[in-house]
Amino acid sequence: MTVTLADTVQEEEPHFEDEQILARKYIETLYDKVKILDTTFIINGLTYDIKCRHFCKKDNGLTIPKKYNPDIKKDFKTNNFATKLTITIGKNIILNKTIEKSDFKNHLDTTLNRYATLLFPYISLTNDTISVNYSISIPGTDVGRAFSFRIGKDGHFVVNGM
């Protein structure tokens, strides 16, 4: 039996436009979901209780220009996201804050300041520092950067690019 090129199955690579459509649809599924990241750590006898709620602000606060949406050739209206974070050590609340894109504004370029939002949070702990890590990205695109909101055990925080 001879196999020819016509007999083989050829898989198409996904089109960039298809990926963008899926990415926008995924972002839209997050509008009504609250991501809950609650955890407890015990380090050197201290109990760290972290309550984190990442949510859509439903503010229609972002208009992504059509140049970032070549498949639909029009602007994409979407929402900002934010994180409500409460950290307790023992019985003391050391931080009770809503984290928003504005907390990172001094570290963002003009494009991310205008069109990006906080996406895909996760929590990490290194020594006595709690980090809430994000992708600050333009929804529906691969344009963005990783950032970290780091909190010390005294409740003071700093913002870092990763």
Residue ranges of model-derived segments:
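Surface-exposed acidic loop/strand-edge motifs in secreted or periplasmic proteins
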Residues: L5-L119
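Bacterial signal peptide processing site
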Residues: M1-T2
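Extracytoplasmic electrostatic interaction patches
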Residues: I94-M162
